[in-house]
Amino acid sequence: MGLALLCRPSQESKFDLDENQVRPYLKLENVRDGVFYVANKLYGITFTQLDNLPLPHPDAQAFECKDKDGSHLGVLYMDFFPRASKKGGAWCGSYRSQTYKDGKKVAPVVTVVCNFTKPAAGQPALLSADEANTLFHDSDTLYIIFSKMYIIMVWLVFRVIL
């Protein structure tokens, strides 16, 4: 954020950019769909909203991610708005990493979590340019979905006896 604040005056003077004038063009659903569009154009994957899965909150969304051949790659949860039980900031994570059980792939379940300002009832959520950038950045959680590797993490604890 520090760099963004330092760059803001030069961006405003160089590009005559006013965050409040950009906001109406960055409707949350359109930016989310833009992330999906870029992922489709780059990797051929598609996203379909799932309405039959439990959600961490009624405002959250779930999407099935399919490879270009139509095979299931994983599930992506997106949770955009703040609430009392949620920490601040934005991040990506994994509810379940890809694994194999009895020789069969168990697909990952990943999440993108943000704390964008929740709109008033009936109004669209409008993002700042910085928030749109955050959504694209934290959507890098897709690397977990793309992974074809099975990784076993081993934690070693060394004790030093003095």
Roles of regions detected by a PLM:
Residues 24, 28, 124-132, 158:
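Alpha-helix N-cap/helix-initiation motif
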Residues 39, 118, 123-149:
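Active-site recognition of the HExxH zinc-binding catalytic motif
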Residues 72, 148-162:
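Acidic/histidine-rich catalytic neighborhood
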Residues 1-118, 162:
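Active-site-proximal, well-structured secondary-structure segments within enzyme catalytic domains
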Residues 14-16, 121-125, 156:
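Short, exposed beta-strand "edge-strand" segments with a Pro/Gly-rich flavor and a Y/T-containing core
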